[in-house]
From Swiss-Prot:
Its main location: Golgi. Its EC number is 2.4.1.222. This is Beta-1,3-N-acetylglucosaminyltransferase manic fringe. Gene3D superfamilies: 3.90.550.50.
Length: 321
C-alpha cells in the first residue's frame, strides 16, 4: 500500500514538473531545488515495485532539419505506443510539433550545429529532465531509431535493481583512448568503453544520481571538453573513468553504422532498437518484406511497426498474422 502511495506521489510530481519544465526552453542551470526535490522523493521510496514501461524515461535527440523527415515517422510508429514516456529534445521551436506533443517537445537553448558542445548541451538537457522526472530508467535514442517498448522493458527487467547499470552497444570492438586535459596544459591518457548514441543506451537512476557532478547542467559540456569527444563518449567516460562503472554490452541495440540486413525477420521483434540510414554509400535498412514497398517505406519502420502491431489502423490487413 505504501509503495503504491509513493509511486502515485512520484507520478504526480513527474506530471507537474514536466508540464512546468519541459514545455519551456531548457536552461543549462536547471533549478537545483527541483533536482534536489526529485532526489529526496527518490530516497523516500521504500522499495521499487516490478518495473513497468511507465518507469522509463525515453529521450529522443533531434534537430530542426529533421522535424519533418524523421520525427513524423517516429510519431506515427513507436512513439504512438509510449507517448507518455517519450520526450523529444530539439533546438528550435515548432508550432506544429508543439500542438502534437505538448510538453513532450522540449525546445533547448542548444545550438543546431552538429558539434561536440551542441550535442553535449542536448544530452545535458535530457539528463536533467530525467533527474526531475523521478523515473527509474533513462534511455537515450536518436531520431533515426525505432524503439521496441516490449523488448526494452524485457531487457531492463533482467538487471538487478540494486546495481548500477549502463547498457548499450559499443561502436568499437575495443575501448576508446582519449587524452584528458589536466592543469598546467598537461594531459592524461584514459581508456574506456562507451555505448554509441546512434543505437541508444540506458542508465538506471541510482547510477545517474552518481553522475550528477559531471553530467548535470553545464557540467556535462565541461566534462566533454576535457576529453574533446562527443556526448555518447562523454557518458562512457563519466561512468567508467570517474565512477569506476562498466558498460554492459547488449547486441539488442542497433545503429545505421552496422549491416542491418544481417538481422533476420524472425529476430526483429526481439531487438530493442533498430535504425536506418546511409552506410558506406548505400541505403542501410532492415530486410523485411512488405506490407509496404521500399518506395512507400524506405526506412522499413512502417513495415516493422505493422509486424509488431498489426492492429494499427493504417496497417494493411495482410500484415495481420
Amino acid at each position: 500500500m505504501h509503495c503504491r502511495l509513493f509511486r502515485g506521489m512520484a507520478g504526480a510530481l513527474f506530471t507537474l514538473l514536466c508540464v512546468g519544465l519541459l514545455s519551456l526552453r531548457y536552461h543549462s542551470s536547471l533549478s537545483q531545488r527541483m533536482i534536489q526535490g526529485a532526489l529526496r522523493l527518490n530516497q523516500r521510496n521504500p522499495g521499487p515495485l516490478e518495473l513497468q514501461l511507465g518507469d522509463i524515461f525515453i529521450a529522443v535527440k533531434t534537430t530542426w532539419a529533421f522535424h519533418r523527415s524523421r520525427l513524423d515517422l517516429l510519431l506515427d510508429t513507436w512513439v504512438s505506443r509510449i507517448r507518455q514516456q517519450t520526450f523529444i529534445f530539439t533546438d528550435s521551436p515548432d508550432e506544429r510539433l508543439q500542438e502534437r506533443l505538448g510538453p513532450h517537445l522540449v525546445v533547448t537553448n542548444c545550438s543546431a550545429e552538429h558539434s561536440h558542445p551542441a550535442l553535449s548541451c542536448k544530452m545535458a538537457a535530457e539528463f536533467d529532465a530525467f533527474l526531475v522526472s523521478g523515473l527509474r530508467w533513462f534511455c537515450h535514442v536518436d531520431d533515426d531509431n525505432y524503439v521496441n517498448p516490449k523488448a526494452l522493458l524485457q531487457l531492463l527487467k533482467t538487471f538487478p535493481q540494486d546495481r548500477d547499470v549502463y547498457v548499450g552497444k559499443p561502436s568499437l570492438n575495443r575501448p576508446i583512448h582519449a587524452s584528458e586535459l589536466q592543469s598546467k596544459n598537461r594531459t592524461k591518457l584514459v581508456r574506456f568503453w562507451f555505448a554509441t548514441g546512434g543505437a541508444g543506451f540506458c542508465i538506471n537512476r541510482q547510477l545517474a544520481l552518481k553522475m550528477v557532478p559531471w553530467a548535470s547542467g553545464s557540467h556535462f559540456v565541461d566534462t566533454s571538453a576535457l576529453i574533446r569527444l562527443p556526448d555518447d563518449c562523454t557518458v562512457g567516460y563519466i561512468i567508467e573513468c570517474k565512477l569506476g562503472g562498466r558498460l554492459q554490452p547488449s547486441p539488442l541495440f542497433h545503429s545505421h553504422l552496422e549491416t542491418l540486413q544481417l538481422l533476420g525477420a524472425a529476430q526483429l521483434p526481439e531487438q530493442v532498437t533498430l535504425s536506418y540510414g546511409v552506410f558506406e554509400g548505400k541505403l542501410n535498412v532492415i530486410k523485411l518484406p512488405g506490407p509496404f514497398s521500399h518506395e512507400e517505406d524506405p526506412s522499413r519502420f512502417r513495415s516493422l511497426h505493422c509486424l509488431l502491431y498489426p492492429d494499427t489502423p493504417w496497417c494493411p490487413l495482410l500484415a495481420a498474422p
